[in-house]
Amino acid sequence: MLDNTRLRIAIQKSGRLSDDSRELLARCGIKINLHTQRLIALAENMPIDILRVRDDDIPGLVMDGVVDLGIIGENVLEEELLTRRAQGEDPRYFTLRRLDFGGCRLSLAMAVDEAWDGPAALNGKRIATSYPHLLKRYLDQKGVQFKSCLLNGSVEVAPRAGLADAICDLVSTGATLEANGLREVEVIYRSKACLIQRDGEMPEAKQQLIDRLLTRIQGVIQARESKYIMMHAPTERLDEVIALLPGAERPTILPLAGDQQRVAMHMVSSETLFWETMEKLKALGASSILVLPIEKMME
């Protein structure tokens, strides 16, 4: 029996979002042994329980108030939302924030030798998918009449098996489509992982814990998107150097011993710092440029 005084978080047991969800919780300082087969894991240092379940169960667990929070792909969340609305329900939940992992797209795909001139090419076709409501919403908006073939896995084999004329499935690289003689023809939904919260009154202690967790998640994401930059920069071109490095705050400038022409500059900059930027810095006279990862960050 779960203790209702503890914060309950549902994550995917295995699959696309599982490892990233576990890493996020670990980097937030939540100490949990998630390497066993247990479906419920208790945090050692916080009043938090982690439920490891199928990804398509997570939205329902949150909407029904069984758990307090869930980490889930927006595609699965939206499909559950549309399913419940089609059944006359009024699902309630809050999206606390979008996360920085789990990116994918839900796309239409057809045989490589089939002509495609837009969604109208699917009129009267049978389409295999695990996302019937997302597919219906999109094609209804396009005025396309079609037949849906619901499959919960191996959707990409449906055309070759004679089950469907086209498919609507998640695409990451497109390699699976290519291996099955298909090509991506239209993106109908783009998704990332998100953190959702159940509707209804939350005990003050739980809400305070959620607020703490959100602050830590924000810090983890900012740290992943940022780098700590150190360099020696010429004083006469300092403004040009700073302009190349987008940062939340102004850099720290320190004098160099015995050098009046240069200063040491330290700053936190976004992940958009690529080799091209470093080459531009060098061209401006910067030297000893170091780019370091950030473990934790709080503004």
UniProtKB/Swiss-Prot annotation:
Cofactor(s), names only, from the UniProt record: Mg(2+)
Functional pathway: Amino-acid biosynthesis; L-histidine biosynthesis; L-histidine from 5-phospho-alpha-D-ribose 1-diphosphate: step 1/9
EC number assigned by the record: 2.4.2.17
Reaction(s) catalysed by this chain's protein: 1-(5-phospho-beta-D-ribosyl)-ATP + diphosphate = 5-phospho-alpha-D-ribose 1-diphosphate + ATP
GO CC field: cytoplasm
Entry's localization field: Cytoplasm
InterPro entries noted in UniProt: ATP-PRT_HisG_long, ATP_PRibTrfase_cat, ATP_PRibTrfase_CS, ATP_PRibTrfase_HisG, HisG_C, N-reg_PII-like_a/b, N-reg_PII/ATP_PRibTrfase_C
Activity regulation, per record: Feedback inhibited by histidine.
Keyword field: Amino-acid biosynthesis, ATP-binding, Cytoplasm, Glycosyltransferase, Histidine biosynthesis, Magnesium, Metal-binding, Nucleotide-binding, Transferase
Pfam families for the chain: HisG, HisG_C
Listed GO MF terms: ATP binding; ATP phosphoribosyltransferase activity; magnesium ion binding
General function of this protein: Catalyzes the condensation of ATP and 5-phosphoribose 1-diphosphate to form N'-(5'-phosphoribosyl)-ATP (PR-ATP). Has a crucial role in the pathway because the rate of histidine biosynthesis seems to be controlled primarily by regulation of HisG enzymatic activity.
Entry's family note: Belongs to the ATP phosphoribosyltransferase family. Long subfamily.
Protein name: ATP phosphoribosyltransferase
